[in-house]
């Protein structure tokens, strides 16, 4: 039964994500979704919050560093992919990306911003920018999971506690 549930979960999540090895450096090695509405619906079904990344691609050196160091950290990637529904929005493109920037009142050509959303698309914790390193991001992930009453994995809690504040 566990195997069936795992296979079903993979098929539910797979269509909204892309392979991490196709990622630009700015978005790290996370397997990202691009369909926020699908992620919100899945959030309602699973209880997992949406991890919504607004990122400049191609981006400046700061955006590239965030992707290379934070969003490629294996422990961060594991926590994002197992505890959240990751969706990326390019903050320097038109179309659906532009529509989402406007919906969330996010500026164009800005440094990365991560928002944590419930199944209705509301912020679970207040928006915060200048979260550019592992520990502050891990702390916000812990805060989000606690706010929605989900268990915080020991590995994520350890990452939030042990990482130097700057990395």
For each feature predicted by the language model, list its residue ranges.
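C-terminal segment of classical bacterial N-terminal signal peptides
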Residues: 13-19
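Sec-dependent N-terminal signal peptides
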Residues: 4-13
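Solvent-exposed loop/turn segments at secondary-structure junctions
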Residues: 57-60, 91-95, 121-123, 131-132
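Non-catalytic, surface beta->alpha helical segment in thiol-disulfide oxidoreductase systems
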Residues: 69-71, 108-152
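Thiol-based oxidoreductase modules, predominantly thioredoxin-like and allied folds used
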Residues: 30-34, 55-56, 69-97
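Structural micro-motif
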Residues: 48-49, 100-115
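Local sequence-structure signature of Cys/Sec-based thiol-disulfide redox active-site neighborhoods
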Residues: 36-76
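N-terminal leader/targeting and pre-domain segments
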Residues: 21-46, 160-162
